């Protein structure tokens, strides 16, 4: 072939070959960017003449072809050129490979890599080839063909995956955590409650400033237990709170008493009673206004439960302010009576019809108090005269001081009334066995020049005397035995003597408490000249009954009706009154979770983060989201997250309103309550934390999917007919799917009990504590010193190891900034380096100046 070239063509030498290869490289680089044009071998540094001649022999056909192209082929704009063709093929190969790596993977490429990017023409044909290609010829390469197949196959694959996900989602069950729904509590559930009363020390342990946070709603709640079901427990707890400070203080007297039965102590009929007599000074200071009902008390629920007012259709955490007297009263709040006594099963329900001798009081009605009492004290016996310390304006004077330590002292007041009052007297007294008939009313002495401000609760016993006082006999009929007189009328504007009650006994649970009132006279200086006007609460009244004489004839003289009407004494029952006030409050709760179909996930907004004060503003949720009978389950899902976003704004507005009113204490109470409710919500939300993590649900998600294996194992199939694509209220859905909620609770309990991962985690934590437990015994300063030494040593070690890499990184950055390009030179063994070797750089010989080379 060399002879053929020599006969027909001129031999191309090294110099011309170098120029032709430079031209070839330039052509490749000028056509739409570089295509890895390669290196001109004649410009390799250190090449010898013999090597150049050898290159010329090897590349002679290539060089002749290049020379022919320069002479024959005219490069026009429409001529694509084979380099542009090769560039198209290579770029298309890269595109297809990228798609394959992206959608399918690298394994199919390794199996069929020999078919990708191959040309469909013979490059050894010597005939001049037309350098024009149409679109059809461009489209016959394997890379484009397989690229189309890859695109279609990937689309089909993703379509199948999408269908599978949709089908799986349709079958999934979703747990809606803390749904905007309230349901009645069960009868067996335990409620935790507390009281809130402003400026009342016995009730300050619960700061309920948010009692006014209410929202109207038309939600229909099925009947459940009311707060009145716990009236007895609430009353007992309130009384303990009211007397807590007194029971902590001094004990006036303590004794043990044995009550024997009809047969003595036979058959275990003896009862040992421990009686505690607290100091009445504490009672009068801290509890008197409470027992009178002057303090407005609100009962508040804790533990995430709320109150639903069946009259106002409102939700709240606390009741409206209530006046709760803790002992029996003649004057007190309104209390409903039951007439058909045969149907009364609860002994606490008041029976507003009773017999006393021949008199039968019935047809009772509550009347508002429109009467005032005026009382004054002039003198009491025994006692002594003492000389009062005088000032320079006054002369020395003597004042009477009673002997308060004497048991003979009997303090009496002279009182009159502004209205005729006929009292139906009977033997029953306060809670417990207290004999005598007492009538009580509050008295308040205003501050004057000679008297300080004082409040005293007067309780008079009118059936003690020897017919010498004006009202002690309290009746005109004589010889009445084993019963109090019935004719006990207090006429208007007539002065009566009133013997003060010196004590009374109350029983709370198993504790019998006796309150001694003898010290009260000394405390409020009643022994001196003392007068007052009654200050009964304006909302109080009394029970006025009709009196009918019995037709039954009995032995002895029995009292008949003195008047056609009479006021029941000790009529008000505190437990029954509290129960009546609380019957309108139904105890409800927010469910921890609600099992719904996976369809709700399609309507769920993007915001997934849960507001931690969801419990605080649940009433706002219900009112704003419209949780009434017209709100469907799907509609609640779409609006729930939007409502949650407004909670913080609502709380800030309430706080700002409190600040405007300068209620600093209430603002502090509000903040404390918010923190407490947040803690309750956090505890409720994290109650099933481990189980929810096993289900793939964290604490910031409201909607969590239940794995299909679990709901199939526990048979949690949802009735799609009842669901009806969400066209059902949440309340109806909850009531009809209680079995689903119970089964999900079983799932949580099983996961909690069988949490092997949790046990392993605790075991690993214990092992880790055993390994590093000795650190806790090291003093704090030694820990700091040891930590500093270890930190410095570790930093120096990292600096030594990473220093070369850091230097190279800095050098490369500097080269990039200055525009240098780093070229990696091939390694040459030292014995091959010759001193006479000439190195060419950019077409010049190394070691020669430009002038010498010219």
Swiss-Prot record:
GO terms for cellular component: host cell plasma membrane; membrane; viral envelope; virion membrane. Residues 614-634 are annotated as: Fusion peptide. GO terms for biological process: symbiont entry into host cell; virion attachment to host cell. Residues 805-854 are cytoplasmic. GO terms for molecular function: structural molecule activity. The keyword Coiled coil applies. It comes from the Viruses. Residues 641-691, 734-770 form a coiled coil. Glycans are attached at residues 218, 256, 267, 272, 296, 328, 334, 340, 416, 420, 479, 497, 529, 546, 549, 715, 719, 727, 735. This is Envelope glycoprotein gp150. The chain crosses the membrane at residues 784-804. Keywords: Cleavage on pair of basic residues, Coiled coil, Disulfide bond, Glycoprotein, Host cell membrane, Host membrane, Host-virus interaction, Membrane, Transmembrane, Transmembrane helix, Viral attachment to host cell, Viral envelope protein, Virion, Virus entry into host cell. It holds the Pfam family Env-gp36. Specific enzymatic cleavages in vivo yield mature proteins. Envelope glycoproteins are synthesized as an inactive precursor that is N-glycosylated and processed likely by host cell furin or by a furin-like protease in the Golgi to yield the mature SU and TM proteins. The cleavage site between SU and TM requires the minimal sequence [KR]-X-[KR]-R. Residues 1-783 are extracellular. Residues 660-678 are annotated as: Immunosuppression. The record marks 609-610 as: Cleavage. The mature envelope protein (Env) consists of a trimer of SU-TM heterodimers attached by noncovalent interactions or by a labile interchain disulfide bond. It comes from Feline immunodeficiency virus (isolate Wo) (FIV). The surface protein (SU) attaches the virus to the host cell by binding to its receptor. This interaction triggers the refolding of the transmembrane protein (TM) and is thought to activate its fusogenic potential by unmasking its fusion peptide. Fusion occurs at the host cell plasma membrane.
